[in-house]
């Protein structure tokens, strides 16, 4: 089991949590992005830089993820693809995407996109908070405990 990170939009505080977990539990954490990433020196942390382009980083994660791997992403279509491959997508706010809920989330995302394209101001997600970081860290800890890490 390893942890993949859709790093282009992942908050820095979440990356910091993952860096600490990588060394403490000796689990491989791989960040994938279309920009250069700074990572602490560790044999358990690596970064993959992909060419710029729509969904290039997402496609690389889908190509590399294996059954049982954890994928950190807030991207709902990527989460759906990860679920199809047997991976476990977790968003940076600490919520797992599941096969039971992903279709509803994809439908809502499409609906909100249609509203925005018709000129409706839908607002955006709430600002990322310390509570979100705590929720993520707690959910990650529970997951790693269940998997024996």
From Swiss-Prot:
One of the Pfam families matching this protein, by short name: DUF188
PANTHER family reported for this sequence: UPF0178 PROTEIN YAII (PTHR35146:SF1)
Protein family per UniProt: Belongs to the UPF0178 family.
NCBIfam families, per the entry: PRK00124.1
Name the UniProt record assigns to this protein: UPF0178 protein HEAR0259
Organism: Herminiimonas arsenicoxydans
């Amino acid at each position: 089991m390893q942890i993949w990170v859709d790093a282009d939009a992942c908050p820095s505080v979440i990356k910091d949590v993952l860096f600490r977990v990588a060394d403490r539990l000796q689990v491989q954490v791989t960040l994938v992005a279309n920009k250069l990433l700074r990572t602490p020196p560790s044999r358990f942390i690596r970064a993959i830089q992909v060419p710029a382009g729509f969904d290039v980083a997402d496609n690389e994660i889908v190509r590399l993820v294996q059954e049982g791997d954890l994928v950190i992403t807030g991207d709902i279509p990527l989460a759906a693809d990860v679920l199809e491959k047997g991976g476990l997508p977790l968003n940076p706010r600490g919520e797992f995407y599941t096969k039971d809920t992903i279709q509803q989330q994809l439908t809502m995302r499409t609906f909100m996109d249609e509203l925005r394209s018709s000129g409706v101001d839908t607002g955006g997600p709430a600002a990322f908070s310390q509570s979100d970081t705590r929720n993520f860290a707690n959910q990650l800890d529970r997951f790693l405990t269940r998997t024996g890490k």
